Swiss-Prot record:
Membrane-spanning segments: 493-513
Organism: Mus musculus
Top-level taxon of origin: Eukaryota
Lineage, highest ranks first: Eukaryota, Metazoa, Chordata, Craniata, Vertebrata
Keywords: Cell membrane, Glycoprotein, Membrane, Signal, Transmembrane, Transmembrane helix, Wnt signaling pathway
Name of the protein described by the UniProt record: Protein APCDD1
Length: 514
């Protein structure tokens, strides 16, 4: 396989698939002409322009976010809610970084998806040193860290007994004589001055400190209210690989306890907590998943292997079809587009997950896809492929959309049609009462969740609902001439739908980028 071909397979395809579902960008501007019978659809387009498109346009215009380079991480940073790691693991985090470069981190673990019943807490101490700007992830900073100690404290007798058995089985002879562990007593899992270590019993790794990004923003354009967010490196989706994995994306951000969203109740609870008083978040009922309406990204999203994108998904619950628009960029603030993907297909009825509390399982199929190169480099790469591997041979031009369904996808992007993926979703509401939609995190090894056993057990960054219902795809396609990224975009509304499906299938190919 040629070097150019490998580059295509490793860069373009992963970027497309890793990103998720999403409908149009604010950059899609429907043509002012209307169909004779399109009064209702014209009203819909006007609403969409003022909602979904406006929200994405806000992101593409910078969203009043500034990135600190190099980042200042001194301070107290806390989770904004109950987080889900692969496994699944339900947790909250409380990290303190001091001016002498030392840190103390709490990782609170729970037995349910609402973080209401703490099971055990890890207390991690160490030292961190910021290095240079990351050459892997633009906008990030690389760091080195050194652990001084890791302790665990159990919050119930049952968990103490269970965890001590697990440690003894994982590291024979590790436990001192005297019986199992007891509740509310801190035990060492690792000490700097000794070789006595058994952190693998709890799948512990702190490599998230190897990649750091700090963002500052003023919500609602209020200069009186600063919110600071700390993004730390992502965690491998296979718990056994965590200690070997170097981050290439981010976890959900922590907020600065001093400069946080004032509506964040969880922030205040976690801020006041410690290993003897773990945070107990307010109980909430799980929302029933209804895949309908339109959903867009809330920020410029980062995927492993240097992929930046925004997503726009459209779900039609009347016939269980979906559309996704994926807008890919070369920069971490999503200002310089590289290519877009529009995908559509069908999805199954949801079934409550027996493995991930609060999750609902779906099966997604994609059978139609369009691609639009948005810069000369991407168009050139696509033109390298010959025959029926990715659209019409040698015909790719910047800003011109092509349907790749007839070539069964696009080899250059690692996409083969038709394709099936096994997904998991959950729905929540934010502090403003808006609905958020989370879909499954892509496997860190770049594979595709194309079998039930490969279904995700954790989630990507959420999309926010921007419209509660949507017209049928056929109506959009026949009556819209949207332009992505201004004049340089595709000619049909189909280009808006593409990113949603791409988001589902891009992650496997992201791995190829590595």
């Amino acid at each position: 396989m040629s070097r150019v071909r490998r580059l295509l397979l490793g860069y373009l395809f992963p970027a497309l698939l890793l990103h998720g579902l999403g409908e149009g960008s604010a950059l899609l501007h429907p043509d002012s002409r209307s169909h004779p019978r399109s009064l209702e659809k014209s009203a819909w387009r006007a609403f969409k322009e003022s909602q979904c498109h406006h929200m994405l346009k806000h992101l593409h215009n910078g969203a009043r976010i500034t990135v600190q380079m190099p980042p200042t991480i001194e301070g107290h940073w806390v989770s904004t809610g109950c987080e889900v790691r692969s496994g699944p693991e339900f947790m909250t985090r409380s990290y303190r970084f001091y001016n002498n470069n030392t840190f103390k981190a709490y990782q609170f673990y729970y037995g349910s998806n609402r973080c209401t019943n703490p099971t055990y807490t890890l207390i991690i101490r160490g030292k961190i040193r910021l290095r240079q700007a990351s050459w892997i992830i633009r906008g990030g900073t690389e760091a080195d860290y050194q652990l001084h100690g890791v302790q665990v404290i159990c919050h119930t007798e049952a968990v103490a007994e269970q965890l001590s058995r697990l440690v003894n089985r994982t590291c024979p002879g590790f436990l001192a004589p005297g019986g199992p562990w007891v509740q509310d007593v801190a035990y060492d899992l690792w000490q700097e001055e000794s070789n006595h270590e058994c952190t693998k019993a709890v799948n512990f790794a702190m490599h998230e400190l190897q990649l750091i990004r700090v963002e500052k923003q003023y919500p609602h354009h209020s200069l009186d209210h600063l919110v600071e967010e700390l993004f730390l490196g992502d965690i491998h989706t296979d718990a056994t690989q965590r200690v070997f994995y170097r981050p290439s994306s981010y976890q959900p951000p922590l907020q600065n306890a001093k400069n946080h969203n004032h509506a964040c109740i969880a922030c205040r609870i976690i801020f006041r907590s410690d290993e003897h008083h773990p945070p107990i978040l307010p109980p909430k009922a799980d929302l029933t998943i209804g895949l309908h309406g339109e959903w867009v990204s809330q920020r410029c999203e980062v995927r492993p292997e240097v992929l930046f994108l925004t997503r726009h998904f459209i779900f039609h619950d009347n016939n269980n079809t979906w559309e996704g628009h994926y807008y890919h960029y070369s920069d971490p603030v999503c200002k310089h587009p590289t290519f877009t993907i529009y995908a559509r297909g069908r999805y199954s009825r949801g079934v409550l997950s027996s493995k991930v509390m609060g999750g609902t399982e779906f099966v997604f199929k994609v059978n139609h896809m369009k691609v639009t190169p948005m810069d000369a480099a991407t168009a050139s790469l696509l033109n390298v492929f010959s025959g029926n591997e990715c659209g019409a041979e040698g015909s790719w031009q910047v800003g011109i959309q092509q349907d790749v369904t007839h070539t069964n996808g696009c080899v250059a992007l690692g996409i083969k049609l038709p394709h099936t993926e096994y997904e998991i979703f959950k729905m929540e509401q934010d502090t403003r009462g808006r609905y958020l939609l989370f879909n499954g995190q892509r496997p860190s090894d770049g594979s595709s969740p194309d079998r039930p056993e490969k279904r995700a057990t954790s989630y990507q960054m959420p999309l926010v609902q921007c419209a509660s219902s949507s017209p049928r795809a056929e109506e959009l396609l026949e009556d819209s001439q949207g332009h992505l990224y201004g004049r340089a975009a595709g000619r049909t509304a189909g280009s808006l739908l593409l990113p949603a499906f791409v988001s589902l299938w891009t992650l496997p190919h992201w791995r190829i980028l590595r």
